[in-house]
């Protein structure tokens, strides 16, 4: 069961926090809100009922007006893949440690291009890296995330596809 491209490229301005509360069997969100150019924020509890969801790919990619994401968006979920989650969200200003506020997200193995092009995102990339100890695919995760406090200290293979 998946929400694939459900609201992609629509005029969605606001997302109700309980939007997916009646769908606990969902296992994947892909391009669900991709390209929603008027969306400015994502509520913290949006996925709280998605207890079986493992895949979150391109969910908010190209949401160019997105500025804020609620605390612990993917907390307590069995997420394994968060590739391209916020790809191209150039206005996203939320601290990466606010979005991922637990000490560990051990189920996550793919963070490829998660924050690619999020030039306004704040916080510390190295801290996020420490929270996802089992990641095996992470190229471009922080590509052009120049507002991170430690952007210049990040390993090259988290910024591009080079070691």
What do these predicted regions represent?
Residues 1-163:
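Solvent-exposed loop and capping/linker segments of extracellular ligand-binding repeat ectodomains
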